[in-house]
Regions:
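Solvent-exposed, non-transmembrane regions of integral membrane proteins
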Residues: 1-371
Length: 371
């Protein structure tokens, strides 16, 4: 019974995430979404207990425990999460910031701007880095894009800056005391995904061969990126693994679709179907690893590991479709038409995530435009 409930919860969460990622309606503030998350935690707790008692796969235990901790940290930490902005001018100390709703947020310290600096590439036009030198409670700190400073329980992030005629810096201040719980959950999810990759294949050699094929497909998409003049937000150690994992995931999903279609015309349909299933599961793990890299990067860049951005939402929808496909009853997964349907849905969501999100209404305020 609980397995059917878990599938319904995943589907409901998926649909609400798709709505937010398409129209920008804040479904994550809806009490129904919170109720679904609480029920998912209960379902995960039961699954973890059953998996330990029945000695099921380690990958499953790690993944379900990780997801439980991510939801726990997000729900329990929401009342204590502070996200505010402040404008600081040279020589002028401020002790309060403002939330997204315009409410005043008192700060436990005073902060002022000593110097703002913009660095450019050799062309003199493309920005390379933005840096603010700050004075906080009499001590000097420096914050720049992807390199926040920390003081008094707050992460201080470079958010914006003034025009050429007026020097000031806009900082984002984030207080997130429950993030360590979320981070542990993300690490367990990553461990479960990596462990699962080995289970999908008979040997590391087979996995490596598939990986090389996927890399060849992924390189085609990576070739269009200009690495020479990356904007400050993209100048991060997480950029390459984040993009590479997604390219591998997308390539694996494309290969899963190709093999699933070919299985209908092959005299070795069972082998082709098994290969398609393995590729589909591999894509699911790689999508999760790509999202985790993106989440840690987002925390480093703008202070929030998940912002319900349009691109984030549709990346999650793609992953949730693969999760829903792998959580179907065995008799459904054995039907080639059902398996093909989920592969097609996930592939379509993947295409929308990669190419079509910028055309959606929710993308107007997207952080992934890097303007």
């Amino acid at each position: 019974m609980y397995r059917h409930l878990s599938r319904i919860l995943i589907a409901a969460f998926l649909l609400m995430t798709a709505v937010e990622g398409t129209w920008g309606i804040e479904m994550h503030r809806n009490p129904l979404m919170w109720a679904i998350a609480v029920l998912m935690m209960a379902s995960l707790a039961y699954t973890i207990r059953e998996s330990i008692i029945k000695k099921r796969s380690i990958a499953g235990i790690l993944s379900h425990t990780g997801m439980f901790l991510v939801l726990l940290g997000s729900l329990a930490g929401a009342p204590f999460f502070v996200d505010a902005q402040v404008r600081v001018n040279p020589g002028s100390e401020v002790r309060q910031a403002f939330s997204r709703d315009g409410e005043t947020v008192p700060l436990p310290f005073g902060i002022s701007l000593e110097e703002f600096r913009a660095d450019f590439y050799e062309d003199g036009v493309s920005p390379k880095q933005y840096t603010s030198r700050l004075l906080i409670d009499g001590k000097e700190f420096e914050t720049s894009v992807n390199h926040p400073c920390r003081h008094g329980g707050y992460g201080i992030y470079q958010a914006d800056f003034g025009s050429e005629n007026e020097e000031y810096s806009i900082l984002k201040l984030v207080h997130d005391p429950w993030f360590p719980i979320i981070l542990i959950g993300l690490l367990l999810l990553a461990a479960g995904a990596i462990w699962g990759l080995k289970q999908y294949w008979d040997s590391w050699l087979a996995l490596a061969a598939t990986g090389i094929t996927a890399v060849a497909f992924g390189a085609i998409s990576l070739a269009r990126i200009n690495f020479g003049t990356l904007v400050p937000a993209l100048r991060s150690l997480w950029f390459i693994p984040h993009i590479a994992l997604y390219m591998l995931a997308y390539s694996s999903l494309a290969l899963a679709l190709v093999t699933a279609v070919l299985s209908g015309f092959s005299n070795q349909s069972q082998k082709m179907g098994t290969l398609s299933s393995r590729l589909f599961n591999t894509a699911s793990s790689l999508l999760l690893l790509g999202m985790i890299c993106g989440a840690v990067w987002a925390k480093e860049c703008w202070g929030d590991w998940w912002t319900w951005d349009a691109k984030e939402c549709w990346a999650a929808v793609t992953w949730l479709l693969t999760i829903l496909g792998t959580h179907l009853p065995g008799r459904w997964r054995e039907r080639s038409t059902m398996a093909l349907a989920f592969i097609i849905l996930a592939f379509a969501a993947m295409q929308l995530t990669w190419y079509g999100v910028d055309m959606l209404p929710a993308a107007r305020s997207s952080l992934h435009t890097y303007r």
